[in-house]
Amino acid sequence: MRKFPWSPVLPLLFLFLSTGLHVIEPTFVEQLRHRVFDEYQRLKPREYSNDIPVRILDIDDESLSRVGQWPWPRDVMAEVVARLNELGASAVVFDMVFSQPDRLSPKSLRKMLPKRPEFEAAREGLLQIPDNDELFAQTVDGAYVVTGFAMTGRETTEAAPAIKAGFAENGDRAAPYLPAYAGAMKVLSNIENKVAGNGALNAIPESDGVYRRIPMFMTLKDKIYPSLVAESL
């Protein structure tokens, strides 16, 4: 009796099985992939190097004790940008959304004062002080500053975030294959108009809730937007 020639068939079976697991990706395969990836990061994490031209400005306890509670007024943030610009920063990137007017701006403080005669002089005096948001906008206009906005799954009535740079597409349209959102929490218009870059802060967690990847591009109403990382580069 002639034996079946398994030698040429086994590689094909292995190929079909591997392809099927990759396409279907059962839960156990996904979990295994995540564990292997995480173990790689623990065994050999990327070493810090002073040669990497990126610095993180961390708001720590010492900073809070010196300057005050967070969030800081926008006039203080303007001083931070100006100082970083003096130190030669190629770009200043904010991983936060300046979506609301500064609550410590003179005009905001003016609204908090009681409307009584004894406070009228203080109310008039606050009108003479420059607005914090305007000071910040003027400062970022003279530096390469990138701000962030947040994509949301809920449609909003406000204008879409500004796109600061165009995109060149080659071949099929990329938009259908990118993460899609219905709305966005954007930066104040007077600040957004002055910054050099504007990118999305969104990241998508894996099924286990861990963030391992950040999309470089995403869409809002079929328009392509860069992530904060892509815009900074």
Regions found by a protein language model. Name each.
Residues 2-233:
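Non-transmembrane functional regions of envelope-associated proteins
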